[in-house]
Amino acid sequence: MTERKHDDTGVEEGTGLATKTRPATKKPSLYRVLLLNDDYTPMEFVVEVLARIFRKSPEDAARIMLHVHQNGVGMCGVYTYEVAETKVAQVMDAARRAQHPLQCTMEKE
């Protein structure tokens, strides 16, 4: 009979678990959702959209609306592709239903 060697834990030397290494998980790309200024959409409507769709506080919604008004474009938030796409569609749908020309886009961060 051959003598088997054991380490300090009592496990036979040379035995162990074979493990597979997982490939690194890639983080999803993020997209900025942007509102574009126009001369016709009421400021109150923009604040309402920011509060309802983007869950902004009244203060944040007013600040973003003023930034859009003064600079021509403003960021509403940063989201994964699917969420950003949904938010853009919701804004465009709300604007269309209210008969406002408000435009919303997304761009890769």
Swiss-Prot record:
GO terms under biological process: protein catabolic process; proteolysis
Pfam families per the UniProt record, alphabetical: ClpS (PF02617)
Transmembrane segments: none
InterPro entries attached to this UniProt entry: ClpS (IPR022935), ClpS_core (IPR003769), Ribosomal_bL12_C/ClpS-like (IPR014719)
Disulfide bonds: none
Positions of the UniProt region annotated as Disordered: 1-23
NCBIfam families associated with the record: PRK00033.1-2, PRK00033.1-5
Family: Belongs to the ClpS family.
Role, per record: Involved in the modulation of the specificity of the ClpAP-mediated ATP-dependent protein degradation.
Subunit structure: Binds to the N-terminal domain of the chaperone ClpA.
Protein name, as recorded: ATP-dependent Clp protease adapter protein ClpS
Species, as recorded: Maricaulis maris (strain MCS10)
Gene field: clpS
